């Protein structure tokens, strides 16, 4: 075929093709059989999480130094694509694990990376991403969730909306205003744990599809977290949020 060598430029590497075959086989054998029930019953696809975790495919983006595969963006796309081929709800497990944890990868301290990326890589907990709010969707910089410094702690108050896998994930990257006079440059990012006192969740949203992946509000009522759970420097949270979307919205 004329010009076929040009198409070779876009051909995935052999390792990516092998990954696709592996994920497809796993998805067809261990995820597809439950897909209809997951959607009809609007229940979280625990079978998919178990299968992906057992195969180390639940968070392939985590760097090797923290126990992950250190996979590139294309590998992440392939995993998401092949899982979505049989169950869209299940595909949001690897997708949102990356979305939620990438701020830590990009901007977190070394201690923060060790504390949260290791458990993520081992499958001990999932990550979610808390940016949008009831009155701050497309205008994310207009968020109202606040984080106030109190000695060696930050105290968070507010609500986040449309949070994927909320209530299932153990860890949440939360964007909150730390200096309301600076708008986007007054927003900081934090890691909040589901077990932190004052964290609660709204009822699952009723959706037309992808019903197995819960979408819920997340409430923060005087949630006190250690000061070292801030991601990066104070005031850099919005920049980190946008960098995260640059990486993850394409995958």
Per-range role (PLM):
Residues 54-124, 165-171, 183:
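Internal helix-loop-helix
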Residues 153, 157-202:
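A short core secondary-structure module
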Residues 23-31, 108-115, 151-157, 189-199, ...:
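Long, well-ordered alpha-helical segments
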Residues 138-139, 154:
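Hydrophobic, small-residue-rich alpha-helical packing segments that form membrane-like cores
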Residues 95, 135-138, 162-165, 179-181, ...:
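Short Gly/Pro-enriched turn/cap motifs at secondary-structure boundaries
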């Amino acid at each position: 075929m004329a010009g076929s060598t040009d198409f070779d430029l876009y051909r995935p590497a052999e390792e990516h093709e092998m990954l696709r075959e592996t994920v497809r086989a796993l998805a067809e054998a261990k995820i597809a059989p439950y897909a209809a029930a997951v959607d009809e019953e609007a229940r979280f696809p625990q079978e998919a999480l178990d299968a992906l975790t057992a195969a180390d495919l639940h968070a392939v983006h985590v760097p090797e130094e923290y126990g992950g595969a250190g996979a590139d963006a294309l590998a992440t796309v392939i995993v998401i694509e092949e899982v979505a081929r049989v169950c869209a709800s299940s595909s949001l497990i690897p997708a949102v694990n990356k979305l939620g944890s990438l701020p830590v990868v990009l901007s977190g301290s070394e201690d923060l990376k060790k504390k949260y990326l290791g458990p993520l890589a081992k499958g001990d907990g999932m990550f979610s991403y808390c940016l949008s709010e009831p009155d701050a969707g497309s205008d994310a910089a207009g968020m109202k969730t606040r984080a106030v410094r109190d000695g060696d702690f930050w105290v968070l108050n507010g609500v986040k909306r449309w949070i994927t896998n909320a209530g299932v994930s153990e860890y949440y990257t939360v964007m909150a205003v730390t200096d309301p006079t600076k708008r986007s440059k007054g927003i900081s990012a934090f890691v909040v744990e589901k077990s932190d006192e004052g964290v609660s969740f709204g009822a699952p949203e009723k959706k037309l599809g992808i019903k197995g992946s819960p979408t819920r509000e997340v409430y923060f009522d005087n949630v006190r977290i250690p000061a070292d759970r801030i991601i990066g420097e104070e005031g850099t949270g919005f920049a980190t949020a946008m960098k995260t979307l640059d990486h993850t919205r394409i995958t």
